[in-house]
Amino acid sequence: MALSATLKRAFFLAVVALSALVVVNATQAMQRPDAFKDAPRKFATSEVKPQVIHKRAGSKVQAAYFTNWGIYGANFQPTDIIPSTLTHIVYAFADVSPDTGSISLTDSYADEQKHFPGDSWDETGNNLYGCLKQMYLLKLKNRNLKVLLSIGGWTYSQSGHFNFVTDATKRATFVTSAVSMIENYGFDGIDIDFEYPTSDPLASGFASLLTSLRTAFDNLQKQKGDSVPYQLTAAVPAGSDNYAFLRVPAMNAALSYWNLMAYDYAGSWLTFTDNQANLYGGVRTNVSTDKAVKWYIANGASANKINMGIPLYGRAFEKTTGIGAAYTGIGPGTTEAGIYSYTALPLAGAQVFENLTDVTSYSFDSSKGELVSYDTPHIATIKAQYVQTNGLAGSMFWDLSTDKVGSDSLVVTTAGVYGSLDQTQNHINFPNSEWDNIRNNMGSSPSAPSSTAPAGSPTTTSAASAPTGGSGQCASVPAWSSGAIFTGGQQASYQGHLWTAKWWTEGDTPGGAAGVWTDNGAC
């Protein structure tokens, strides 16, 4: 049996290697550019007719990465964030020591020190400033906006930074460090962008790390008496080379969401031009978002935990005749070669093409032979509708500093398709923080969380308010309901059995594949 499984795995990996042209550097966009402090290069752009969004649906996740280097050259500040279009801000990036597993911030000035308008220069105490203070202020004013610290990314995944996951002692250090980061800086959880666990030991260690983090976060919630859990997410690849080793069932049990990096399917590593974020198709690269989504679900991921990544940038090819053709060069890009911010697209003189079969778009300047693969609002709309149709959690964006504003914004576009967004409350109570102003809520009373959901939102009840169901040991516990929220340790009756939630859950059926519930036996 063991030999057979090994041979099957070897055969699968051989097929992947022969059939796919995507290589391990396919998400290098999720890194800090070398010239991040320089102003982005400016390019003339073409006008595109804004798309009008009519469809509305149930509550969804809108998660977007905010980079701590974006405050420099891109001049994108925390005050530029539009909270009403987001449910999660993923703050990128922190680093991890491969020697110890300890987490560290990567830019003390941006993260902790920069003074923004309204910040005092002479207040007493040990106070937090920088972007992280601004994130906490956003949370106080928008009680349904969650902020997670992202650890890793392409840059901080290199040189064996995540090799620590194979060592139980270093994993334990990481977990302790993660809890400290949450408590000190007022985060709602942790996101891990490990690019990539491409071996059995790394994948197994990564799954073990996530399991330990989930346990620690649930314990933290219980210790503090919080009503909602601390969230754990992972940025995961869409290319089979990079997801083949993942321990999906174990990861799914630990994760709040999978942030699917559904982009960078094409770039300078290919010998031909292609779409970088096609929903379907992918005949030349053997990669598509739909294929990746189906793989994750088939291998144990819950559909309602998957956030589809949408790029807020384009990948360029020079001196080419079109999609699938050869090219020479990738152009200067906005902040790094070959990558143009969505704000700069389409480039002047280019015509925009949309393929509604594969659900892709690109601009092409035939006079220059310049092609840029990126998502238009229309394509983002179709992707959001796919999220709805397939019961996915929502959308994820890389990164906020490169989005447009108003009706051209892809974040605004998908929020408009979804209508109502996730209303899960954030955390503001951090009495153990090392920072005085985090401990005292910045000296002000926080805004109350939203008490009414937008039109079209499903009604959600807490487990405490749900009707009881059953007799015997089930007599005093609520009956399970798909619209009720249960936190770790709470019980429910379902189909004549008593069940105990392992962690926060909404809509996960007792006994289902998500593995959220423990069966305590018949009532």
Give, region by region, the residue ranges found by the protein language model:
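Fungal secretory targeting signals
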Residues: 1-48
